[in-house]
């Protein structure tokens, strides 16, 4: 490209379903009609079942609620993660793993009742486990690994 040229991107015609659009970041965004349920899930059902099991059994073992958030975290990722934690049932006894793939951010926040039970050392290990899988392109595997590592490191109350 020479100085002053305008960069253009070739836009191949995509056969997108009704209500779908290609965003500037290259992702496909889709909506459904009001009152209809979406049948297009971002992850295979079996992956969601395994994640649900990790959350359920991890929460039971640690006697603390584990939760996962995937989405944008804004400019202050830690503050946004704390806001999301406040909306989790029993936020004082909860651990939230918040991941923003577009920002390449991973945050772990937890309530006051979990503090001092091992989460301080388990959280960095969970983030490391997640990041290793994320680098390989495995979002769900990273979430599952992080939840398992962190829940194993938190002692029951």
Curated annotation (Swiss-Prot):
<feature type="cross-link" description="Isoglutamyl lysine isopeptide (Lys-Gln) (interchain with Q-Cter in protein Pup)">
    <location>
        <position position="115"/>
    </location>
</feature>
<keyword id="KW-0832">Ubl conjugation</keyword>
<dbReference type="InterPro" id="IPR033437">
    <property type="entry name" value="DUF5130"/>
</dbReference>
<keyword id="KW-1017">Isopeptide bond</keyword>
<dbReference type="Pfam" id="PF17174">
    <property type="entry name" value="DUF5130"/>
</dbReference>
<protein>
    <recommendedName>
        <fullName>Uncharacterized protein MSMEG_4692/MSMEI_4575</fullName>
    </recommendedName>
</protein>
């Amino acid at each position: 490209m020479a100085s002053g040229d305008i960069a253009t991107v070739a836009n191949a015609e995509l056969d997108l379903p009704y209500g779908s659009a290609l965003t500037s970041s290259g992702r496909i965004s889709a909506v459904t009609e009001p009152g209809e349920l979406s049948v297009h899930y971002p992850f295979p059902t079996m992956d969601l079942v395994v994640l649900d099991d990790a959350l359920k059994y991890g929460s039971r073992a640690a006697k603390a609620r584990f939760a996962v958030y995937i989405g944008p975290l804004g400019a202050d990722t830690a503050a946004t993660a704390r806001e999301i934690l406040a909306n989790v049932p029993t936020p004082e006894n909860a651990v939230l793993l918040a991941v923003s793939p577009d920002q390449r951010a991973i945050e772990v926040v937890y309530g006051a009742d979990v503090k001092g039970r091992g989460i301080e050392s388990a959280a960095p290990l969970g983030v490391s486990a997640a990041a290793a899988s994320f680098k390989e392109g495995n979002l769900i595997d990273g979430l599952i690994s992080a939840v398992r590592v962190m829940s194993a490191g938190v002692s029951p109350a």
